[in-house]
Every structure is written in structure tokens, then in C-alpha cells.
Amino acid sequence: MARRGKKKGRPISGWVIFDKPKGMGSTEAVSKIKWLFSAEKAGHAGTLDPLASGMLPIALGEATKTVPYVMDGTKVYRFTVTWGEERSTDDLEGQPTKTSDKRPSREEVEALLPDYTGVISQVPPQFSAIKIDGERAYDLAREGETVEIPTREVEIDRLEIVGFPDADRTEFEVECSKGTYVRSLARDMGRDLGCYGHISDLRRVEVAPFTDEDMVTLAKLEAVWPPLPPKDEDGNVIEPAPRRDFSALDALVIDTGAALDCLPQVPLSDDQAQRVRLGNPVILRGRDAPLEADEACVTTRGKLLAIGYIEHGQFKPKRVFTAG
């Protein structure tokens, strides 16, 4: 039987709440963060278009097991709609497909906002990651195909105007559910206002439970990144190579358990924690310990240990984290 190769990188776990710059793709961002931290594993919790900037939560190591909880979290975006043009991609990158000389007043835009609050139906953009018969919609669109993308329901908790710099542009902030396409919002509002519109600026400022205060820029990460050992002209590391000190960089990592604020969290004693590490259930003690929960997590010494469920006051682990 073939032996599994040794993983490359450090076994670091946690969340890097990356302030992605414009022009960088989400996959590129993950690769960059993984390289900076020399991490064994990394993944993101929700694609952010290259045109967009802002929050891209990136999980390292065992935190990748908690990605679904962050992907389900509420998102907050700030965006600018430029009126008068609808574009093929519903943002600046596309070609104009429809134009109008009309420009909406602030009052007209404000009157429309209630129609885009609550549970609404929207069709994702032609240039999106939606799969159609096993292929990405954006791949089909690049080949010149116009595809039928099913309507989906999304939830808009809040949509408000935050700026009206001139007649051509309106600035918004939206708080919305997973799966909401802000580009579709701009397109549909433009159609309803009879003037067309597209996204000209987009920034994600929140992915629950993380906030803008958690974000770190590439410049901040690179400023504390430990340099690689020097090499000779043949590309070989010059020995003795100094040990790289990642402590300043690792200080910017948020604990894995922060992604699970939506779940009941119960601290365990050292003895209980050891039982859970072995996959065994434990009786939860304490006045505030829950008796029942479809999903919950337990911690040890302030660190996430396991996700599971609680039945008759007993925690039963489903996923144990070795970093705990």
C-alpha cells in the first residue's frame, strides 16, 4: 500500500480575515496567505470577485472544517451603482448592453428600496460561478452562450443609501444572506428605475461573525513576515540557516472557535477534554450547561476542541480538532 506523503508546511490553525485588494482573485488570495504563513492547508469562506475589495475570511489548517459556518453567515457590502448602462457582467468589467439617458432622483431610489428588502427573488449574473449542467455559468458566458439561470430566493435584511455623489452614481450598504448577488441587485434596480445600472465599486465589510476590525491588509502581513533563509548562487540554502520566527505573523490569526459564535459553547475540564479527544461523550456540568442542542461546541482552556450535539445533558462529539 502506498504511503501518504508528508504534508508540507506548518500545522497552524485559525482564521486570517484578509482585506483583499481589488484585482486579486479569491483563489490567488488563498494561495498568497497559505504561502505567507507556510500553512499545510488553507481555504476561503465565500468567493469575492476580483473587482471587489474587502473581507475574505481565509481558514488555515483545522479551521477549514468550520468554513461552512462562516459561509452561512450574514454579509455586509458597500457598493456604488452607476446609472445609465447595463453591462454584460453587471459590473465595470463587462461591455455595455443597454443604455439610457435617464437618471433617477434620490427620492425615486429611496422609494424603491422597500421592494428589495426581505425575501426577494433574483437571477444570478450570466458571469457567475453558478453551475449549469455541470459547467460554470461564467465559462459558458465567455464562450458566447446565453444560459438560463434559475431564479433563487435570497434575504435582504437591510438596504440603504449611504451616498449620492452625483446624478450618475448612488452609494449603498446592504446586509444580506448567503447567495445574494450584489451585481444582480444593481441590475434589477436599474431596470425597475427605467435607467439601467451596473456595479462600479464593491467592498465587503463584514462576514458574520467577523467585522471590519478583524481585517488585516497584505501590507500588514508582509511587514511581519519572516524572510526566507538566504541562498547561494546555485539556489541552495546557506547553512546554518536561521530559524524563521513566525510569532508576529501568527499573532494576527484569529482562533478557530471564533467562527462558531452561532453555536452554544461549553468549557470542559482537562479530564473531560481528554475523553472528547478520544471520541467519547461527556456529561456537561454546571448550572448553565444546556441539556439539549442539535449542534454545539466544547472548548478547553479557551480553545475549540470539538463540534457535536447535546442530548440529555451529554455532549457527543462529531468532529474533534487536534489543535484543541
Curated annotation (Swiss-Prot):
The record's EC number reads 5.4.99.25
Is tRNA processing set as a keyword in this record? yes
Pfam entry (one): TruB_C_2
The record's region (Disordered) falls at 87-107
- Identify which residues the record assigns to the active site: 49
Any one GO biological process: tRNA pseudouridine synthesis
CDD domains per the UniProt record, alphabetical: PseudoU_synth_EcTruB (cd02573)
- Molecular function via GO: RNA binding; tRNA pseudouridine(55) synthase activity
Q: Which UniProt keywords apply?
A: Isomerase, tRNA processing
Q: Which reaction does it catalyse?
A: uridine(55) in tRNA = pseudouridine(55) in tRNA
Q: What does this protein do?
A: Responsible for synthesis of pseudouridine from uracil-55 in the psi GC loop of transfer RNAs.
Family listed: Belongs to the pseudouridine synthase TruB family. Type 1 subfamily.
Know the name of this protein?
tRNA pseudouridine synthase B
The UniProt gene name for this protein comes to truB
